Amino acid sequence: MFKNTVISIKSSGNLIVLKTEAGSAGPAAELIDKLSYDEVLGVIAGDNTIFVAVDGLDHVDTIRRRLEDLLEANRLFN
């Protein structure tokens, strides 16, 4: 599911912003919530954008890489 919906992953400050196909931010955000990363304070989804609030700037790169790895793994196996 993740590979078919996420277009890009970028970060700014302690936020990670994921752009998705129209209408698919909600299911992708739910998946991120279910991953239960301790460093993630919360996830908010609109129609085609997801904001992931990270607990401190020092964890942003780690969480962004995990999400990018998840996206790449889904592309390889689907």
PLM ranges: what are they?
Residues N74-N78:
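Long, charge-dense
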Residues M1-R64, L70:
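Non-DNA-binding regulatory cores of transcription-related proteins
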